[in-house]
Amino acid sequence: MQQSKEERVHDVFEKISDKYDVMNSVISFQRHKAWRKETMRIMDVKPGSKALDVCCGTADWTIALANAVGPNGEVKGLDFSENMLAVGKEKVKALGLEQVELMHGNAMELPFEDHTFDYVTIGFGLRNVPDYMHVLKEMTRVVKPGGKVICLETSQPTMIGFRQIYILYFKYIMPLFGKIFAKSYKEYSWLQESASTFPGMKELARMFEDAGLERIQVKPFTFGVAAMHLGVKPESE
């Protein structure tokens, strides 16, 4: 029986959890840290805020949010991979971040009331969900009016020449890195597949609008290999 996308993605992340952080740095040449740092600067997270990190994985962005909201804030991290969460929980415990709660859950059915969070983020996770629009609408539902929904994700470079290099890298070299560094050629082949079919920047910006967000900001990184999309929930619906 053929696996659904959700089942396949779950299997991938359960298998690569112990090498995920190392591989993130290898395949992005450490750039993912700078992308997240700049995204956080644009977000301008206020101390004492409530934030939700969807598809939080090993909790790197969750931890950055916790540092930004401070001890009087609150951060939830949600992921459907227990193994990824286990890695994240060890990090959170080591840092003593009592304002963080990591939980097992599904991005398609966020277990929160409407208008709960000031910020809702998803980092390198939207491309792996079964329905992009459904998850964006769920994120919009649980953010407060005036709150921000933010996606940091791989994208499709538009610069001629560089786009071809990017495609070759993702299709052939990244899975090879997965085999060398994580013994996971098949799993990293899936990650390049999910990245190659993900909407480009303009299309994702339209999806943010269709999800009910306004004042959309788009910030490309490293010639467009990744991009931040930020939208604000209207004050009155």
Curated annotation (Swiss-Prot):
GO MF annotations in UniProt: demethylmenaquinone methyltransferase activity
Gene3D superfamilies: Vaccinia Virus protein VP39 (3.40.50.150)
S-adenosyl-L-methionine among keywords: yes
UniProt entry keywords in alphabetical sequence: Menaquinone biosynthesis, Methyltransferase, S-adenosyl-L-methionine, Transferase
Enzyme type, top EC level: transferase
EC numbers for this chain: 2.1.1.163
Keyword set includes Membrane: no
Residues binding S-adenosyl-L-methionine, per UniProt: 58, 79, 106-107
Reaction(s) catalysed (UniProt annotation): a 2-demethylmenaquinol + S-adenosyl-L-methionine = a menaquinol + S-adenosyl-L-homocysteine + H(+)
Superkingdom assignment: Bacteria
SUPFAM superfamilies with a match to the protein in the record: S-adenosyl-L-methionine-dependent methyltransferases (SSF53335)
Pfam family, one: Ubie_methyltran
UniProt pathway annotation: Quinol/quinone metabolism; menaquinone biosynthesis; menaquinol from 1,4-dihydroxy-2-naphthoate: step 2/2
One BP term from GO: methylation
Biological role stated in the UniProt entry: Methyltransferase required for the conversion of demethylmenaquinol (DMKH2) to menaquinol (MKH2).
Family recorded in the similarity comment: Belongs to the class I-like SAM-binding methyltransferase superfamily. MenG/UbiE family.
HAMAP family the UniProt entry points to: MenG_UbiE_methyltr
PANTHER family reported in the protein's UniProt record: 2-METHOXY-6-POLYPRENYL-1,4-BENZOQUINOL METHYLASE, MITOCHONDRIAL, METHYLTRANSFERASE
Cited NCBIfam families: MenG_heptapren, MenG_MenH_UbiE, PRK00216.1-4, PRK00216.1-5
Record protein name field: Demethylmenaquinone methyltransferase
Provenance organism: Bacillus cytotoxicus (strain DSM 22905 / CIP 110041 / 391-98 / NVH 391-98)
Lineage: Bacteria, Bacillati, Bacillota, Bacilli, Bacillales
